[in-house]
């Protein structure tokens, strides 16, 4: 199959899926407004097909679709910088890692410390949730220069960097209730309050997830087209 044709098909499928989602959202808004005004939405159904062909709807949602595409591109750019996963870095790479990203959460750990393993588990969960923040860890035994420079005395120690500057830190579990059974959400909320994570609205998460799924469906459809052509 012609590669350009595949790309065109993928783009059209993705756009169609997003527009379908937009139409469903618009339909919900219309029905909600009717209900608020005291009308009966059961007797005033909105035709989904008509909404899909409505140029006004396309205009209203064009900016949102473009914004979603920009967000996907932004996420890919972050991932190329090492965001989106919880990685171990060496002392030699440490300085470059914390200065190349605006927000960096770095866990100084010891491989034999039980509490460090607990912190590892939670940070590993948070890393893919918050792609705009970089999550890394450094073996304190193998990074004596920065352990001394940052005056790290207790492990686990999670140092919070903003634009290359250590702005704050979590020492042990002091900010987490001092017990070992704190939840990932507890840690997430602490990091949110300290400005290290960006809080997204639920509807933005839903829309982004739906857009990502539409892209995946389009890719699968494209692959099926390739198989059929064979």
UniProtKB/Swiss-Prot annotation:
Q: Which residues form the Thioredoxin domain?
A: 89-173
**Alphabetically ordered keywords of this record:** Cytoplasm, Microtubule, Nucleus
Residue ranges for the region (Disordered) are: 197-230
Q: Where in the cell is it found?
A: Cytoplasm; Nucleus
Main localization of the protein described in the UniProt heading: cytoplasm
What single Pfam family name could you report for this chain, choosing any that match?
Answer: Thioredoxin
On the tree of life, the source organism's domain of life is Eukaryota
* Signal peptide interval: none
Any one Gene Ontology BP term: cortical microtubule organization
- Residue ranges annotated as coiled coil are none
Q: Cellular component terms, GO, for this chain's entry?
A: cytoplasm; microtubule; nucleus
Q: In which tissues is it expressed?
A: Expressed in embryos, shoot meristems, leaf primordia, root meristems, floral meristems and young floral buds.
Query: What GO molecular function annotations does the UniProt record carry, in alphabetical order?
Result: beta-tubulin binding
Q: Does the keyword Cytoplasm apply?
A: yes
Describe the function of this protein. Answer: Tubulin-binding protein involved in microtubule formation.
Q: How does it assemble?
A: Interacts with TUBB2, TUBB3, TUBB4 and TUBB5.
Report further notes: Plant roots over-expressing PLP3A have increased microtubule resistance to propyzamide, an inhibitor of tubulin polymerization. Plants with reduced levels of both PLP3A and PLP3B show defects in cytokinesis, cortical microtubule array formation, oriented cell growth, and maintenance of proper ploidy.
Tell me which family the UniProt entry assigns to this protein: Belongs to the phosducin family.
**Protein name, as recorded:** Thioredoxin domain-containing protein PLP3A
* Organism of this sequence: Arabidopsis thaliana
The lineage, from the top, is: Eukaryota, Viridiplantae, Streptophyta, Embryophyta, Tracheophyta
């Amino acid at each position: 199959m012609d590669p350009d044709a595949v790309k065109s098909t993928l783009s059209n499928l993705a756009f169609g899926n997003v527009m379908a989602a937009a139409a469903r959202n618009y339909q919900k808004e219309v029905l909600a407004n009717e209900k608020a005004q005291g009308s009966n939405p059961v007797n005033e159904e909105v035709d989904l097909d008509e909404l899909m062909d409505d140029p006004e709807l396309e205009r209203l949602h064009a900016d949102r679709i473009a914004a979603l595409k920009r967000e996907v591109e932004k996420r890919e750019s972050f991932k190329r910088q090492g965001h989106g996963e919880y990685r171990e870095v060496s002392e030699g790479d440490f300085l470059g890692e914390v200065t190349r990203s605006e927000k960096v959460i770095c866990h100084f750990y010891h491989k034999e410390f039980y509490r460090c393993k607990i912190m590892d588990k939670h940070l590993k969960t948070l890393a893919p949730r918050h792609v705009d923040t970089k999550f890394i860890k450094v073996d304190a035994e193998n990074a004596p220069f920065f352990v001394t420079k940052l005056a790290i005395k207790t492990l686990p120690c999670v140092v919070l960097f903003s634009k290359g500057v250590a702005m704050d830190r979590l020492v042990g579990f002091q900010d987490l209730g001092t017990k070992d059974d704190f939840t990932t959400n507890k840690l997430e909320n602490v990091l949110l309050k300290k400005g290290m994570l960006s809080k997204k609205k639920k509807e933005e998460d839903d829309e982004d997830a739906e857009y990502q799924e539409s892209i995946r469906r389009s890719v699968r459809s494209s692959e099926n087209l390739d198989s059929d052509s064979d």
